């Protein structure tokens, strides 16, 4: 019963965020992303695949609605046994802010692979929105939002 209640609440809108800085938005996104990933992966292990993918896409759309400007089109969904974002393991290593644009760089510490992410944000009406997240490696930057 509790599981159903939590899932029916969904995600709050960007205006409901208690995040006033780019760093706070990034950390909140990491937390919500990890929750979405873990729920989607667990359901994928237990339920029918097509229904799970529809629910995962719905959850992803809610995440995008919460953290991006209206009309943003994200990348195809991807979830797995280990979340790509987790505020307990992915640490902010730099923040650059110039008026209404911010770049927050993070490092995700893992045993065999420690990816770097670059969160790009823009500010509109006193609210910071994600505009893209790039996975950064030696070969370039790859959009992942």
Q: Predicted regions span which residues?
A:
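Short, aromatic-enriched amphipathic alpha-helices that serve as compact interaction elements
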Residues: 20-40
């Amino acid at each position: 019963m509790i599981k159903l209640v939590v899932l029916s609440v969904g995600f709050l809108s960007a205006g409901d965020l208690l995040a006033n800085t780019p760093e706070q938005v990034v950390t909140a996104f990491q937390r919500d992303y990890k929750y979405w990933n873990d729920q989607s992966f667990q359901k994928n292990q237990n339920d029918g695949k097509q229904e799970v993918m529809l629910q995962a896409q719905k959850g992803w759309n809610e995440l995008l609605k919460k953290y991006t400007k209206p009309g943003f089109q994200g990348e195809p969904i991807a979830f797995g046994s280990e979340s790509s974002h987790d505020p307990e393991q992915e640490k902010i290593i730099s923040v650059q802010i110039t008026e209404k644009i911010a770049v927050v760089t993070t490092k995700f510490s893992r045993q065999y692979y420690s990816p770097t992410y670059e969160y790009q944000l823009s500010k509109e009406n006193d609210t910071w929105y994600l505009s893209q997240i790039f996975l950064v490696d030696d070969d370039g930057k790859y959009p992942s939002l």
